[in-house]
Amino acid sequence: MALRRETFESARVADFWTGSVSDDYRLTEAIRTAGLGIQFAPRAMVATTGECSASEFLSWAVRQLIITRVYRPALWWLGFLAHLLYCGAMLAGVVVVAGGGLWALPILLLGFVPGMWRGVLRERAARVMFPGRAAWFGRYGWVYAWLTPLATWVWLYVFLASSFRRRIEWRGNIYELRSPSMTRLVE
């Protein structure tokens, strides 16, 4: 997020950052509290090109959702309930179809199609945003759509893993997130 120094000072961003581990959520809160708006700037996006293992990704994702649960609990609950409902419906559909209820197959597929279509749209938008990554998209672009059903289950796992924890590990330190304005260094 970019802002002018005058805006930073008048919105008291430094005060909002005190005791915080999340600069993004607290900056957003400071800007909104000041009655100002935030605009999405697509050209400010940067591609992450580093590699990470599945374990590293899951650790990062759980950390992000723990932070979200502490700083924006309503948003966390909305995401959790949406994933729980979607995965529950998907599981029910698979059970019915596996039990011989082929009538449910079109309904099950209708559950997959919108998410997969959004994946196609995300991939197309990413291609436009990152033209220098055309070779990567040519090789891996398909995952945006075809792994969407699996990704939904991964995110449900991440939501569940973030449900009851307030401790995060970041850059070798463990922090306890007591509130949006109170973070304790554990070790």
State each model region's role.
Residues 2-4:
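Conserved beta strand-loop-helix elements of the APE1-like EEP
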Residues 114, 118, 174, 181:
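A broadly conserved detector of short glycine/acidic/proline-rich loop/turn motifs that flank catalytic sites
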Residues 182-187:
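Short, surface-exposed, low-complexity cationic segments
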